[in-house]
């Protein structure tokens, strides 16, 4: 009997039972206790039934019991030893702290990725620079080679520039010496092709003997003296050369022949804005020009079309063919030696 009584007393001495008895003795309900402790009614019920919530830490559970004991005027020292025997303090499950190693790994991986990206960019830039430098060196070598070829051609020609005349045009040599006189009559001048240069004034100077009237010698001499005085008043450039008939006009010079060929059909005009190496070859294979032109120079060429042009610096000149401009923009943009053929479209 004593053993059963002690077991009943042990059962009634649980913290939940004692708190419930104290609450009932004060005439309080679970709802009232929950409102005063700012807890849920289910939490008060679990405390009175000695049910420890699995998701509730033991520290909070003990705190709720202490607050409940103060509310119903029970000493805490009597409840805590019983609570420790009934439910020992459980070690709180502490979640393992996530280290920053994962973030460091991500940063390290991002660092490697950025380094690899920069390496690719540097390699691309290096290849681009090497490609540009090789093209530049090739252009410089090509220009130097063309200049050497031009110098060699000039040395083979005896240092004389290439003549700028058309193959079909006959060059007229200048006649600075007076025309020879044979038996009192002027000898007709001939050009390189052997054709005689005649003048209508020479023909008209021969008197026609169609009239039978006598000629007054005195009047004729007077007239000749008057004509001599009138010719003395003429400018020196109009004075006839010795041995040349008075009424004969001056012969055309070589300058007139050059200007005529420059203004002929198929003329090629080049205006230079800077120093530039140039080579022009016509359809017959004749080199019309090969060398360096200074800035500000104007070059007029005439030959048999089409023309093959090799230009060292396309941006240093403008070209017009038969009055129409020649487009060099693609060579200027590419920054390379221009090789083109100019012909009638």
Swiss-Prot record:
SMART domains: HTH_XRE (SM00530). One of its GO terms (molecular function) is DNA binding. InterPro entries: Bact_Cytoskel_RodZ (IPR050400), Cro/C1-type_HTH (IPR001387), Lambda_DNA-bd_dom_sf (IPR010982), RodZ (IPR023690), RodZ-like_C (IPR025194). The chain crosses the membrane at residues 112-132. Residues 229-241 have a biased composition (Low complexity). Residues 133-345 are periplasmic. Residues 30-49 bind DNA. Residues 19-79 form the HTH cro/C1-type domain. Residues 188-225 have a biased composition (Polar residues). The keyword Membrane applies. GO terms for biological process: regulation of cell shape. The keyword rRNA processing does not apply. It is found in: Cell inner membrane. Its main location: membrane. GO terms for cellular component: plasma membrane. Keywords: Cell inner membrane, Cell membrane, Cell shape, DNA-binding, Membrane, Signal-anchor, Transmembrane, Transmembrane helix. It is a single-pass type II membrane protein. Residues 151-259 are annotated as: Disordered. Belongs to the RodZ family. Cytoskeletal protein that is involved in cell-shape control through regulation of the length of the long axis. HAMAP family: RodZ. The helix-turn-helix (HTH) motif in the cytoplasmic domain of the N-terminus is involved in the formation of spirals to maintain the rigid rod shape. As this protein is anchored in the cytoplasmic membrane, the HTH motif may contribute to protein-protein interactions to form the RodZ helix, which is localized beneath the cytoplasmic membrane. The C-terminal domain may be critical for determination of the rod shape by probably interacting with enzymes required for synthesis of the peptidoglycan layer, including PBPs in the periplasm. This is Cytoskeleton protein RodZ.
